[in-house]
Design a protein with these regions (language model features):
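Short amphipathic, positively biased membrane-proximal segments
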Residues: 1-136
């Protein structure tokens, strides 16, 4: 069984690496989706645009603590569930070649599973404030 902390850190690393690839080598990501970048490089812009966002939300999962981390974990579920729905619709419509479409669905579903695992584990976490009540 995957523990929540490992799920969160794994998802963070995936986000950081994918975001960095989007920023620095969008053509590689486009190629993995079956796009001939010699003919069409229009996808480079959105990959770069979302690359920095993806890096930052990955860093949030590594660096935030307490309530801020719980919020980031909760948002990760929404983000990756939406990605999975988007990948599924894209594959079903044939907007990507079959193999790449199915791979996008599988990858998105794995990320959603990691996000849910991290979020559920975070719900069970007890904050220091709850353990040691603060008197003011």
């Amino acid at each position: 069984m995957l523990i929540p902390t490992a799920a969160r850190k794994t998802l963070a690393v995936i986000r950081i690496l994918n975001g960095a690839m989007g920023l620095l080598a969008p053509e590689k990501l486009l190629g993995r989706l079956g796009v001939d970048t010699a003919q069409d490089r229009s996808g480079a812009y959105p990959f770069r645009m979302f690359g920095i966002r993806t890096v930052l939300i990955g860093l949030d999962l590594l660096l935030l603590r307490g309530a801020e981390l719980r919020r980031a974990e909760k948002l990760a579920v929404l983000i990756h569930a939406a990605d999975t729905v988007s990948a599924t619709v894209t594959a079903a419509r044939g907007d990507l070649p079959r193999k790449q479409g199915l791979m996008a669905v599988v990858i998105s579903a794995i990320n959603t599973t990691l996000a849910v695992t991290a979020w559920k584990g975070g719900q069970d976490a007890v904050t220091a404030h709850e353990v040691v009540p603060q008197s003011h």
